[in-house]
Amino acid sequence: MMASTTSATAAGGAFAAAKTRAGSSAAGGGACARVAAGGRRRSGVVVRCDAGVEAQAQAQAVAKAASVAALEQFKISADRYMKERSSIAVIGLSVHTAPVEMREKLAVAEELWPRAISELTSLNHIEEAAVLSTCNRMEIYVVALSWNRGIREVVDWMSKKSGIPASELREHLFMLRDSDATRHLFEVSAGLDSLVLGEGQILAQVKQVVRSGQNSGGLGKNIDRMFKDAITAGKRVRCETNISSGAVSVSSAAVELALMKLPKSECLSARMLLIGAGKMGKLVVKHLIAKGCKKVVVVNRSVERVDAIREEMKDIEIVYRPLTEMYEAAAEADVVFTSTASETPLFTKEHAEALPAISDAMGGVRLFVDISVPRNVSACVSEVGHARVYNVDDLKEVVEANKEDRLRKAMEAQTIITQELKRFEAWRDSLETVPTIKKLRSYADRIRASELEKCLQKIGEDSLTKKMRRSIEELSTGIVNKLLHGPLQHLRCDGSDSRTLDETLENMHALNRMFSLDTEKAIIEQKIKAKVEKSQN
């Protein structure tokens, strides 16, 4: 995929539109269509950051109609194993492709990531897996032994978990494969695919995926390396482009939105309530301070986290209220920020109706700003006359500020992304020949051991001392190593010589043919067979 420049808003329902006009672009069977230089594709959508709004809309419409989405393509692909190595893929949805109502049904709490990874890697065609679930996205990264079968299994897993029919999910899911999947992760880590372009919290979330995956054992060598390289890319982009300067985060956008909805004359006197003292909640307090707020009430399950925030932030009065007093605290607040991991709503229409009215000076409306996924505040709360609800999908009007400057920096960031992508691809390409190297060594060693045994029998082992036997074994090993040195040198693909990847792969295939070595395709099929047998036991 060519260099991309900004996070694109993928159009829901792209699959249906693509079916009728995508025949020519789908030819060739590639999972991901190429896009024009300076563009970016997500579910068949390309956006250029150097184009105007009208040009962007036109580009989106053309790309959507001209591309068969990967999820549609995998359904019509030949249902057999065609690749010689496993495929890396990402499948998921984000704020760009799906509403919060759908994202919250698929959200996976951080403490459940290891369990999700274990379930995914137990699928017949999934070798490695990682889950990245935040308020703005739910993405599953996998190494699939068969990419079309593996993706089908992942979609079925997502459908079963969320209760959403697979056909409905496909209207909002995107899927990327191999280098496109890797580039996407690098862009996510760099903040280029965020609702808030350049925001920094996503990098910490990518780091947490690595820590969580290492504990569960699901991050095999491919995904582990890919995520670590994504962290490197994210750090480089922030250091070398300064893209985060002036950027807003979800928490700061939430504060900004609340202040936009309050009467200007009453912004600083509004009574602020925060429910949840986690990372996002802490950032809400930080940005309230930056806006001049002098007091905030914090409701949390335990007082320890609130004390830690109070100790760190001396410029604001923080009042702690236990969770049992949440509704009493809400009755005394003009603005309620919610940021908890609760999977059920904390506030329903009935709760909001029971709260007292707000003074006319504050606009007569209590504001609920919900930055949790799953949502902490039911959408029907807005049906109450003196209440309004805003969730993460409502932050878009805030993040437009300073966007043009960050888009220019995003273009600079693509150079770094491409450099890190090439490094990862070179590393992965170097693994291509590893199975052949192992099989060739094993083949040669079997012959060596067999011929050595014949030789020792002819000589008579009783007539040999231990030293003589060891010398003969070392001689046979040395001869094999010398003979293999040349062929194995021609299988190196680490950039240490002038050989291209194509030349190295030609050498690999030649050795496989000459020595009748098992192909990597056979190894993949053996892995699948082993997983199927294990699941049946």
Swiss-Prot record:
It is found in: Plastid, Chloroplast. One of its GO terms (molecular function) is NADP binding. It is an enzyme of class 1 (oxidoreductase). Its main location: plastid. SUPFAM superfamilies: Glutamyl tRNA-reductase catalytic, N-terminal domain, Glutamyl tRNA-reductase dimerization domain, NAD(P)-binding Rossmann-fold domains. InterPro entries: 4pyrrol_synth_GluRdtase, 4pyrrol_synth_GluRdtase_dimer, 4pyrrol_synth_GluRdtase_N, GluRdtase_CS, GluRdtase_dimer_dom_sf, GluRdtase_N_sf, NAD(P)-bd_dom_sf, Shikm_DH/Glu-tRNA_Rdtase. The record marks H184 as: Important for activity. Keywords: Chlorophyll biosynthesis, Chloroplast, NADP, Oxidoreductase, Plastid, Porphyrin biosynthesis, Transit peptide. One of its GO terms (biological process) is protoporphyrinogen IX biosynthetic process. It catalyses: (S)-4-amino-5-oxopentanoate + tRNA(Glu) + NADP(+) = L-glutamyl-tRNA(Glu) + NADPH + H(+). It comes from the Eukaryota. The active site is at C135 (nucleophile). One of its GO terms (cellular component) is chloroplast. Catalyzes the NADPH-dependent reduction of glutamyl-tRNA(Glu) to glutamate 1-semialdehyde (GSA). During catalysis, the active site Cys acts as a nucleophile attacking the alpha-carbonyl group of tRNA-bound glutamate with the formation of a thioester intermediate between enzyme and glutamate, and the concomitant release of tRNA(Glu). The thioester intermediate is finally reduced by direct hydride transfer from NADPH, to form the product GSA. This is Glutamyl-tRNA reductase, chloroplastic. It comes from Oryza sativa subsp. indica.
